[in-house]
Amino acid sequence: MSHSQYKCQVQGKESYIDNQFVIFSQSYLMNQVHIYNKEKGHTTKNRVNLLELGCYNGRVMHFMTQQMIFVNYTGVDVTPQYLAHSPVARRKDVTLLCEDVTKGLSIADGSQDMIISSEVLEHINPEELPGVMRTLYDKLKKGGRCCVAFPMNTRDKMFHNLEKEKGLGHVNFPVYEDFIELCENIGFTLHHYDSGFSLKSSFRTPRYGKDPLYDKLRDRLGSPAARAVWMTITDEHTGGGYFTFDKL
């Protein structure tokens, strides 16, 4: 597994890039947890067992508690320094594990109701990706759900170039069609797919003056935030995506 030397946060000082990632990627995943809770009837007394792969310091759990979304949370990250500064490490409903998913996970098979992961799979070498997705499938309960987000390409268009993103630690951009096929061959069933924000994508937003909604977003939020919002709400492929699968 390739470990990125790129840091969006240094000593607690958040960058603008990191804030965009939290708002437009991790917020999506948190909302999917909320939706799953409602669908399955989970409450604070009947909590979802949630695994987050590439959890950084467990901040998604921290954000969820602020939104009154309570789960039994297991966060996995390969970098011990991140876990050492977790804001949720002392919570009784939190388990933090420093493990490399390409070498397997110590979590019991069939123990998790839901798995989420954002901006992780592009750091995993392509030959290791099938094994990683098989591991995630095995950890899910029957009826469980997996939601993963990452920068991607399609068979028709290359949104990302590895040579241009080596500095971010990226080693693989899964192809949309191939990734769905891979996961379905493992046993997953695609629940839905949504386009999403991706930092280095070659996706082009509408030219100013061509779309009133985009113009309004740009006038009020500025170009970077308008671009991120647009990539999140469009039905076009953007070079970033959220894949949600069920284990039926």
What does each of the following model-derived ranges do?
Residues 1-108, 114, 118, 130-133, ...:
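Conserved N-terminal segment of class I S-adenosyl-L-methionine
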Residues 171-187:
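Short alpha-helix
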Residues 148-170:
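Short, glycine-/aromatic-enriched active-site segment of Class I SAM-dependent methyltransferases
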Residues 192-248:
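A C-terminal cap/extension of S-adenosyl-L-methionine-dependent methyltransferases
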Residues 87-88, 157-162, 202-208:
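Short aromatic-enriched loop/helix-cap "lid" or pocket-rim segments at secondary-structure transitions
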